[in-house]
Each structure stands twice: as C-alpha cells, then as structure tokens.
C-alpha cells in the first residue's frame, strides 16, 4: 500500500545523503568544532592550500610613506625611540610632525589592481595575502571601528582590500588577508595591558569586530594572523572566533588559517604552522607548514633606502622554493609596494623570474607531495617531490661532467627519465656504488629553458 509518510521519509533521507556527499566533494565533511584547541586542531586542512604551494605576500600601509628602516617605523621611532629613527625624523620632517601626518601621503595613486593581479599570475602564485591591517592599526578597508584611520577615510580614499581581492579572483588566485591582533599604540590595548589583561576592551571593540567584518565582507580563503605574542589566546578570544569561522562563517569549508593566535600557539595550534618568520626546518615536519620570506631581506614593507645587497638573488629564491616544497611546506614570498601603489622594477623582476621557472618546472611543484627521501647530496644537491606515481629530482647546480648521480631512486627496466622543458628521454645507467648515472643534455650556453634548478622526471621507479 502506498504510504505518503514513508515516501517523504525516503526523499528526505536521500536529500541528506546528497548534501553529505556534496559537502565531502567540496572539501570538508560537516563537523561541529568547539572553542578549544583539541577540537579546532582536529579540523583537516582544506586541500587547496597544500596543492597551491606558492603564494605572494604584500605588505602595504602607512609605513610605506616614510619608507625607511622597515614597516616597524612607528614603533622604532616613538616606541623604542631609536636614535637613528629620531634623527631621521628631525632631519626630514618639521617639528611636531606625527605618524598620523603620513597617512594623507599614502595615496595609492598608481595602484591598478588588474596590473598587480597580472603580475602575480605571471609569477605563478596560486594565492595572495595582503596586509589588511598591520601593527600600526591603519586598515586597508573601510572598517567601521577604525574611524579616520582607514584607506577610505584618509589617504587613497579607496577600499584596497576589496579592489585587489576582486582582481586576483578573476584569475582564479586564492585571496588571503593578513591581520594583526594587536596595535602598538591603541589606547584601549594599552589600557588592557595596564589592567593586567583582566579587561578586554580592545578585543571586544576593535580586534574581533574587524575580524568578523573581514570574513563576512571579503570572504577570504586564508587568514594570516599576527601580532599575538604579548597576550594569551584567552585574551584574544581566538578559539571562539575560530569555532565560528569553522562552523558558521561564509568560508567555513575552504578557509585556512595559520598558527599565530596567542602566546605559545605558534608551531602548536591553528591550521598550518609558520612557527617564526623565515622558518626553515631541516627535516620533514609532521604538520603542514609555510615559509614566509621577503625579496628585501631587511624589511617586509617598501624602503627607499634599500640596496641591491639586501635584495635576494633569483636563484636563491628558487632554491628556497624547491627546498620548501620538498619538505612539505608552502612558500610565501613578500614584496612591499610604495606609497603610490607601485611595485618597483626589481621586485617585479624577481617575481617574473620565479614565474618563468615555474612555467617549466611547476609540474614538480604544484599539487606535489614529499617523496620518501627529501634530498641527497652527491655532485650536486638534489631535492625530491612526487606526484601521480612520478618522482621529480630537482638539482641545484649543473655538474661539470654533465652527469647527475642519484642514490635514492630504485630503477626498473621500464624506468624513463626526462628533463622538464626538454624533449626526449635521457640516457641512464645503474652503478652498484654510485647509484643511477644520468647523462644530461649537451646544449650551447643560454639555450636551456631555465638557468638554474633543473628538474628530472622519473617514471616507473620502485
């Protein structure tokens, strides 16, 4: 006999199965996270982040106006009262000039987000992280809790966060936002510290409203938290925010976060680990991590006083990228635009060099996994990755005799070896002592597809 109740039950159950399958296909299965680290740390990292491998960091704010020393200019000048910074201000600015007086000069006059996005795409970046707010407290979007200290009210009179996000997403580049939890000189933060952190005036009226606003307004794929180190996560209400982010926010299924959410959180809690600036482990970690570094070794923000001696060589960038990916990390490379929104030519040159290398060798980078052996050193340093049953061996220096020897791969009679960017198979032999000996192509100088870090692809190896 036909039963209406049974039929509706069957339809409802089928819809639930369909929704569950859909959620799993999109990344993460439905799960409720509680505001504590054991629960939050159990959340799987969305797959896109590990597959992306290479991102770009952009430090841009009012500190781009004095553009001297580093993006910590305000703190060094009026927090530490460094003699060098005090002297710089005395020699270049009139008496009574305040840090806030720099803001109108932060014009972003030549900021063309489409051009930036084109550059980032040409660099091979799969995600971009912009400083929405650094420790100075100036927000690069029209924050309601940062009156007259944001990019809409003063300076550019533009929503910098929104404009760049729209441009990069047109190119299928993931968009992340850096946000500093603390601010050096905010009166409410100083009051909370004076009260021994027994009050949370700053958190409730500034930090948390900003974070919720950023997520709801821009729906970032990544939140790069910083400025956490002076206070425990209980002061910042970090676990409550992350539980909301993972359970209820509009980006709950795809958002990725780092580990800077309070004292003692770094390298212990959160999504992936930064551990420290320019962190570089010596062996394969058991947790997903990211190395963040800067083209200008002495600063994250733009400096008028930078010199070529502080600019990282393109070969060094590529070597760091290769090493980082082989050890299971992501590589986040920083540049600092100037106050007018110009990415200076030397920074563009470095980014385009990375992009050129990735056009040839990206197969060994994007969506790869660490191999059972991460590196070896014989005639040259070799770093390994693997993907789709192939093994990739990237060697950093061309051997003088034109022969690369690999100790780790176990060859079979069906093994084939090619070089990315070159046609044809390479000749190889197996030696019981030296391992696999691979004869490299003999071509005139300047005719190789890349000038450093060449990648061998090995198929059908044990």
UniProtKB/Swiss-Prot annotation:
Site feature May be important for catalysis, where: 292
Q: State the UniProt keywords alphabetically.
A: Glycoprotein, Glycosidase, Hydrolase, Lipid metabolism, Lysosome, Signal
List, alphabetically, the InterPro entries matched.
FUC_metazoa-typ, Fucosidase_C, Glyco_hydro_29, Glyco_hydro_29_CS, Glyco_hydro_b, Glycoside_hydrolase_SF
Q: What is this protein called?
A: Tissue alpha-L-fucosidase
**What is the first-listed, main subcellular location in coarse terms?**
other
What is the catalytic activity of this protein?
A: an alpha-L-fucoside + H2O = L-fucose + an alcohol; a neolactoside IV(2)-alpha-Fuc-nLc4Cer(d18:1(4E)) + H2O = a neolactoside nLc4Cer(d18:1(4E)) + L-fucose; a neolactoside IV(2)-alpha-Fuc-nLc4Cer(d18:0) + H2O = a neolactoside nLc4Cer(d18:0) + L-fucose
User: Mind telling me which PROSITE patterns this protein's record contains?
Assistant: ALPHA_L_FUCOSIDASE
Q: So which residues have sugars stuck on them?
A: 237, 264, 378
Q: Where in the cell is it found?
A: Lysosome
Identify the stretch annotated as signal peptide in this record. 1-28
UniProt lists the family membership as follows:
Belongs to the glycosyl hydrolase 29 family.
Q: How does it assemble?
A: Homotetramer.
What would be the name of the gene that encodes this protein?
A: Fuca1
